[in-house]
Each structure stands twice: as C-alpha cells, then as structure tokens.
C-alpha cells in the first residue's frame, strides 16, 4: 500500500495499481484481479474521506466522515532511529493501537487513520486482523499523477453513490452474482473462475453457491460498524 502525501490532500492506494495504470497507458486491456476496498482520498488533517471501491467491474466513489478520538499514552519505543509514541482509539467497531512520531510532522497515516500530532508509523486492531506498518519514506522528485489510480482507475471514472447504496451493491452482488452476463448473448462472452471457463447462464448458475461461499469466507471489513449481513 502507498500513502501518497501532497500539499493539500493525501491518497491511500494499492501499490499494484501504479503498475496496472502504466500498462493501461501503453494500451493494454486490464481487469482487476482483486477487490478495490482500501482506496482513500482526503484533505490533509480532515476526517472527511472519499472512498473508492469496485463492485462487479464498476468503479464507485462515496463520501464518509470518519472522526477518531485518540487517547495519547506515555509509552514510547524506537524504530529505525525514530522515536514513536503510543495512542489508542475505538473506531469502526474495533479497538486500534497506533504508534506515531513527532519527528515527522504530518498528521496522517494509512487508510483513514489521522489527526495524531505526527506521522503514524504503525496501526493495528486489537485482534490483529489488520496491521499497517510503515516500511519506507520516499520523497518523490518527479511528481506522479496518482489521480489515475484513485479518482479514475484502469480507465474507469467512478460513479458517485452513498454508503447505503454501496451496501446494497454488495448484497446484490451476493444474491445475483454475474448478473451483467445474464442479458448478454451466449457466445459473446467468457468468464474464468474457480478453474472453470464459463460461457453460458447454466455455467454461471453452477458456480453461484461456491461464489457466495467465497464471499462469506473472505468478508472481514475494516469497519465492522458498516458491515453488511449476508
């Protein structure tokens, strides 16, 4: 993951998207091999986030306000010559532990975590389901236009929706997977999933339960308070 800090805003996105974007710029046709769920843009030191997600090969954007109330503790430690200080918060249905450094005066961090008096180097939930750790800090001499992997992605412009609409999209994707193929003429499309090449509606029906089971088994949203019930 990349935390991309600019003068007025920050972006958080998958590093893999940079490579995919470069391929698209060279004329390649690319599709996602993974769900887009943690792509975020916000103004510096703001709790107002723009969330970018993909569902059924479409790209969406919805706003959210994600205020965090941090408790800064006296405990400190050192990491790569940086002095880190501990902080805690309960947010999104989870308890989080963070380590930030006053030596790097940016009140930002991974995903939606921010508003501590220094850059967040580490943050994880109490059950260790999610664990973000800063690997390196790089100053980019030639500015990369990361809007191509956030505000648009693989040539797709986002459709503006609400959180509620996003939740409905997730439920619909579970109840009616691959619905976009049902109206397409047989022989004009193909889909490879679960090591099977599907070319007709009957094939889609045969993998529906496996697809739904995969969704349930892999569903572990960062923000439990916004989770949908399958």
Regions picked out by a protein language model, each given a short descriptive name:
Residues 76-79, 83-138:
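Glycine- and acidic-residue-rich phosphate-binding/metal-coordinating active-site segment common to enzymes
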Residues 1-76, 83, 96-97, 128-230:
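Extracellular or lumenal secretory-pathway regions
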């Amino acid at each position: 993951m990349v935390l991309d800090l600019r003068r007025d805003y920050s972006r958080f996105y998958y590093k893999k998207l940079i490579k995919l974007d470069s391929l698209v710029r060279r004329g390649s046709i690319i599709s996602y091999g993974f769900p887009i769920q943690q792509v975020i843009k916000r103004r510096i030191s703001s709790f107002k986030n723009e969330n970018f997600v993909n569902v059924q090969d479409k790209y969406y954007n919805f706003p959210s306000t994600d205020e965090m109330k941090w408790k800064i503790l006296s405990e400190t430690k050192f990491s790569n010559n940086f002095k880190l200080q501990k902080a805690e918060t309960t947010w999104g249905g989870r308890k989080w532990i963070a380590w930030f450094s006053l030596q790097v005066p940016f009140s930002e961090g991974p995903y939606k975590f921010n508003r501590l008096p220094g850059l967040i180097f580490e943050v994880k939930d109490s059950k260790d389901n999610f664990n973000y750790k800063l690997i390196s800090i790089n100053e980019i001499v030639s500015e990369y236009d990361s809007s191509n992997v956030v505000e648009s992605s693989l040539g797709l412009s986002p459709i503006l929706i609400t959180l509620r609409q996003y939740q409905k999209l997730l439920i619909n994707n579970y109840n009616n997977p691959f619905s976009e193929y049902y109206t397409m003429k047989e022989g004009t499309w193909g889909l490879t999933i679960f090591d099977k090449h599907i070319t007709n509606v009957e094939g889609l029906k045969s993998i529906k339960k496996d697809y739904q089971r995969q969704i349930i088994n892999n569903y572990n949203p960062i923000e439990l308070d916004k989770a949908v019930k399958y």
